[in-house]
C-alpha cells in the first residue's frame, strides 16, 4: 500500500530569502483573493462555478497586465497551486465538508506550495526551492519516501517547511485483536470501555488569563506600530505553545490507544454544532449564554476532532480500524456494566 506522510521542519533562511518568501506568500494570497472575488461576481450574475482551467487563464492575464506585472517575479507553480487550493475549497463546500471559501488575510496562514522542482540534501540539512535557492533547515529526523510536494508556511514570525512524501509499504497487520469503545468528554478527555481513563490537559484553560492580559495590552497600542507588532507576536507565540501542548498530549493518548487495540469505536461527534454560540438574535435572545460560552471553550480545548484524526491515520498505518457510530445513547453504561 502507498503511504503519504508529512515531515515538518523549521527553516533557517537568510534576510533576502525571508523577504522573498513574504513576497511569494503575498502574491499567492493576492491571486487567491482576486480569483475568489471573480467567482463571487460570477455567482451573483447567476452563472455556474468556473473550474480551475479557466482560472489558470486569469493568472496569465494578470501577469501580462500592467498593474499586476509584479506577479512575474514570483514562481508560477505556487501561484497555480493557490488557484488549485481555491478549487479544492469550493469542492469541499459543494460536498458540505466545509464552509464557503473566504478571503485570506495578511499574516494569517501565510503559505505557498511547490509541487516539483525541489531538491533535498538531508546530509547537509538543506533544501533547494525554485527562486529561493538552497536554504538550511533544522533537521530533526530522517525524511523517508519520494518527495511529492513541499509547503512553506509562516507561524509566529518563524518559517517552516512541510515535506510530503509517498512510500510503498507492505499491508500492515495489527498485533492486537481487541476492540474498545472510546467516549470523549470534557471532565475526562477519553474513557475507554475497558475502564481506562485519560485525564484532560486543558492547555487553554490553564493559561487563559495570560492571553486576556496580553490582548488588553495590545488594545492600548497604536495599530501596526512596532510595539503593536511585537505584542501581537507574543500573543501568537502563546497560542502556538498552547496548541503544541494539546497536540503533544493527544499524540501520546492516541498512540497508546492505537497500539493496544485493533478496532476503536468512537462517537461521530459534530464538534462545530456542539460548540455553537447560544447568544441567539435580538428578537430571540438565547439563554444561559455565559455558561454555554464556557462549555464551548472547554469542548474546543479538548481537541476531539484532532484526536479522531490522529486515531484514524495511526490505525490505518498499523492495520487497525476506527469505526464512528451515532452518538445517541453511547454513554449509558460504565465500563464495569
Predicted feature locations:
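Short glycine-rich, polar/acidic loop-and-turn segments at beta strand-coil junctions
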Residues: 15, 25-26, 36, 92, ...
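Gly/serine-rich nucleotide phosphate-binding loop at the start of the catalytic core
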Residues: 1-79
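Acidic carboxylate diad motif detector
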Residues: 53-155, 280, 297, 301
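Positively charged, helix-rich recognition surfaces that bind polyanionic ligands
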Residues: 5, 19, 131, 139-146, ...
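Long, hydrophobic, amphipathic alpha-helical segments used as structural scaffolds
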Residues: 36-43, 90, 94-101, 167, ...
Amino acid at each position: 500500500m502507498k503511504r503519504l506522510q508529512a515531515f515538518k521542519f523549521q527553516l533557517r533562511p537568510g534576510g533576502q530569502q525571508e523577504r522573498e518568501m513574504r513576497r511569494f506568500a503575498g502574491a499567492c494570497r493576492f491571486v487567491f483573493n482576486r480569483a475568489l472575488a471573480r467567482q463571487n461576481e460570477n455567482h451573483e450574475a447567476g452563472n455556474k462555478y468556473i473550474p480551475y482551467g479557466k482560472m489558470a487563464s486569469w493568472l496569465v492575464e494578470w501577469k501580462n497586465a500592467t498593474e499586476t506585472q509584479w506577479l512575474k517575479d514570483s514562481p508560477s507553480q505556487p501561484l497555480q497551486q493557490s488557484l488549485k487550493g481555491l478549487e479544492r475549497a469550493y469542492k469541499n463546500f459543494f460536498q458540505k465538508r466545509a464552509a464557503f471559501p473566504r478571503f485570506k488575510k495578511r499574516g494569517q496562514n501565510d503559505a505557498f506550495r511547490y509541487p516539483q522542482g525541489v531538491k533535498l540534501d538531508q546530509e547537509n540539512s538543506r533544501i533547494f526551492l525554485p527562486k529561493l535557492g538552497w536554504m538550511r533547515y533544522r533537521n530533526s529526523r530522517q525524511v523517508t519516501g519520494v518527495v511529492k510536494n513541499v509547503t512553506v508556511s509562516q507561524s509566529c514570525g518563524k518559517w517552516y517547511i512541510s515535506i510530503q512524501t509517498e512510500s510503498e509499504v507492505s499491508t500492515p497487520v495489527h498485533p492486537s485483536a481487541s476492540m474498545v469503545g472510546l467516549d470523549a468528554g470534557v471532565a475526562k478527555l477519553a474513557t475507554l470501555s475497558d475502564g481506562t481513563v485519560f485525564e484532560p490537559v486543558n492547555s487553554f484553560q490553564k493559561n487563559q488569563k495570560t492571553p486576556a492580559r496580553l490582548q488588553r495590552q495590545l488594545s492600548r497600542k497604536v495599530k501596526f506600530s512596532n510595539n503593536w507588532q511585537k505584542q501581537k507576536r507574543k500573543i501568537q507565540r502563546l497560542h502556538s505553545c498552547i496548541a503544541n501542548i494539546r497536540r503533544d498530549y493527544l499524540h501520546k493518548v492516541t498512540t497508546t490507544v492505537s497500539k493496544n487495540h485493533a478496532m476503536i469505536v468512537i462517537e461521530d461527534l459534530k464538534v462545530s454544532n456542539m460548540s455553537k454560540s447560544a447568544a441567539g438574535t435580538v428578537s430571540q435572545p438565547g439563554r444561559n449564554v455565559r455558561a454555554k460560552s464556557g462549555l464551548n471553550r472547554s469542548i474546543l480545548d479538548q481537541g476531539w476532532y484532532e484526536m479522531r484524526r490522529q486515531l484514524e491515520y495511526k490505525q490505518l498505518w498499523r492495520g487497525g480500524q476506527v469505526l464512528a457510530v451515532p452518538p445517541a445513547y453511547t454513554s449509558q453504561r460504565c465500563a464495569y456494566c
